[in-house]
A protein has these predicted regions:
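Conserved active-site alpha-helix within GNAT-family acetyltransferase domains
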Residues: 132, 144, 156-174
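Conserved acetyl-CoA-binding loop-helix of GNAT-fold acetyltransferases
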Residues: 121, 127-140, 163-167
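Conserved beta-hairpin
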Residues: 53-69, 75-94
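A short beta-loop-alpha structural element at the N-terminal edge
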Residues: 6-20
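C-terminal "cap" of GNAT-fold acetyltransferases
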Residues: 108-110, 167, 175-192
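Conserved acyl-donor/pantetheine-binding loop and adjacent beta-alpha core of acyl/acetyltransferases
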Residues: 79, 83-85, 91-118, 126
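Conserved GNAT-fold acetyl-CoA-binding loop/helix
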Residues: 19, 26-46
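Conserved GNAT acetyl-CoA-binding A-motif
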Residues: 135, 142-154
Length: 192
């Protein structure tokens, strides 16, 4: 599934499309009564910082154009990249997460880990397994780098993420305080 998705580092030219996807996710969460991401987070500065630090990753759907140009309108040039639409975004962090040092509970491992923050999928791609595939590709990258586990946190009312974490084999480890509130923390250890 999803062989046509290229998992790559985000570039500054992707930032506006990423923010469009973030705004779509914020609207969906609001419509579902999910309180996460309703306070202006993540902002453009967060995404720009992710990209500058090398944390930002996207899924680019091969061979599709983002928007067809109207008749007589010049096509956008994308610095030599093959045409493709960015359909998902996440911040993939290998530097640790300071908030994870004070967990009300216990992590399953004590070694290096990868963290995924700000995972969002474009409206037209939801329900097709894109988020789960993004998580699997992030896990594969982490395994290549030799880290011992994959950690993630989410809001208590983010039902979609909670179900996906369970399906992907993550274990609930406790609660952490991150940003504006308490989050549920999960970990998936990698076998040696």
């Amino acid at each position: 599934m999803n062989e046509d998705l290229k998992y790559r580092k985000a570039e500054p030219a992707d930032a506006e499309r990423i923010m469009e996807i973030i705004r779509q996710a914020q609207a969906q969460m609001r419509a579902l009564g999910n309180l996460q991401w309703q306070d202006g987070y993540p902002a453009r500065a967060d995404i720009d910082n992710d990209i500058a630090r090398g944390y930002g990753y996207v899924f680019e759907k091969s061979g599709t154009a983002e928007e067809p140009a109207a008749a007589g309108t010049p096509q956008k040039c994308d610095k030599g990249r093959a045409s493709g639409a960015v359909i998902a975004y996440g911040a993939v962090v290998f530097d640790g997460e300071p908030a994870y040092g004070a967990i009300d509970g216990a992590w399953l491992t004590g070694g290096d880990y990868v963290v995924l923050h700000r995972l969002a999928v474009a409206d037209g791609e939801k329900g097709r397994g894109v988020a789960a595939e993004f998580m699997r590709r992030t896990e594969a990258l982490a395994r290549e780098r030799g880290v011992s586990s994959f950690r993630v946190d989410t809001n208590f009312d983010n039902r979609y993420m909670l179900r996906m974490l369970e399906r992907l084999g993550f274990a609930y480890c406790g609660k952490i305080v991150y940003g504006s509130g308490e989050r549920l923390a999960f970990e998936k250890p990698f076998e040696a």
